[in-house]
Amino acid sequence: MPRHCSAAGCCTRDTRETRNRGISFHRLPKKDNPRRGLWLANCQRLDPSGQGLWDPASEYIYFCSKHFEEDCFELVGISGYHRLKEGAVPTIFESFSKLRRTTKTKGHSYPPGPAEVSRLRRCRKRCSEGRGPTTPFSPPPPADVTCFPVEEASAPATLPASPAGRLEPGLSSPFSDLLGPLGAQADEAGCSAQPSPERQPSPLEPRPVSPSAYMLRLPPPAGAYIQNEHSYQVGSALLWKRRAEAALDALDKAQRQLQACKRREQRLRLRLTKLQQERAREKRAQADARQTLKEHVQDFAMQLSSSMA
């Protein structure tokens, strides 16, 4: 498993490219080390509940050298190896904290300020001069009001068919904090162009059920209940089970092939031994035949010499 930086918003991993760039990884001090609290406090990362500071249970938590200042390292040896000093603490986390605050600001809707309320009030007052008296404008509800109540989520067919149907200036709705800027632009457009008397507003027709209503009832993804302390996620358990079964089947097949190869090797060894024995017997028979022939030749030579004498 490759090492990676556990700081919020940092995606640096221990690869060949990062090592060539001179980026090193340093492990979080153990729980009995007083510097551990400083490291966790400076990284400004919250626990999964979002209440306190992040205190991981794993012993393999690393921070890359981009979060340390230059004076936190020292040169060691002739090769120029940069080693982290004993009392070094990571302090460079500003950019990642700003990024996290920006994403949080985008994800929540806050009530408009006094300047926006006064601008919307003046715009609605100019538009109401041509329509008649209206009820006084009320500011949008506070941010703690839920934007999507259960009644609207259970009956999506009652939503308007198009965003053209705007709310009245005096009415307050849970969607007013989301439709505030859009409603102001639509009111300005309505002030510039008066509606013709021939065009009558058509009754709202029920729209088809959006697929998002069914997406809310889908089960969570596999491994969603597992607490993630790292930037990677555990895959599907069913997928890993299938991979394990496929690996076991491949291992069983390889073992059967190995046993068959061993039996074939044993048969070949026995056949080779028999051939060697037959070859040795043939050599001994040839040697005996030569010796017998030599003896016969010597006897014939002796008989021939004795007969000539």
From Swiss-Prot:
Localization: Nucleus; Chromosome
One GO cellular component term: nuclear speck
Keywords for the protein's UniProt record, in alphabetical order: Chromosome, DNA-binding, Metal-binding, Nucleus, Phosphoprotein, Transcription, Transcription regulation, Zinc, Zinc-finger
GO MF, any single term: transcription corepressor binding
Record keyword Transcription regulation present: yes
Disordered: annotated segments: 158-209
Modification Phosphoserine occurs at: 162, 210
Biological process terms in GO annotation: chromatin organization; negative regulation of DNA-templated transcription; negative regulation of transcription by RNA polymerase II; regulation of DNA-templated transcription
Pfam families reported for this sequence: THAP
Gene label: THAP7
Role: Chromatin-associated, histone tail-binding protein that represses transcription via recruitment of HDAC3 and nuclear hormone receptor corepressors.
Zinc finger intervals, THAP-type: 1-93
Protein name per UniProt: THAP domain-containing protein 7
Motif window: HCFC1-binding motif (HBM): 229-232
PANTHER family on file: THAP DOMAIN-CONTAINING PROTEIN 7
Feature: compositional bias, Pro residues: 198-209
Keyword Zinc-finger (UniProt): yes
Subunit structure: Forms homodimers. Interacts with HDAC3 and nuclear hormone receptor corepressors. Interacts via HBM with HCFC1.
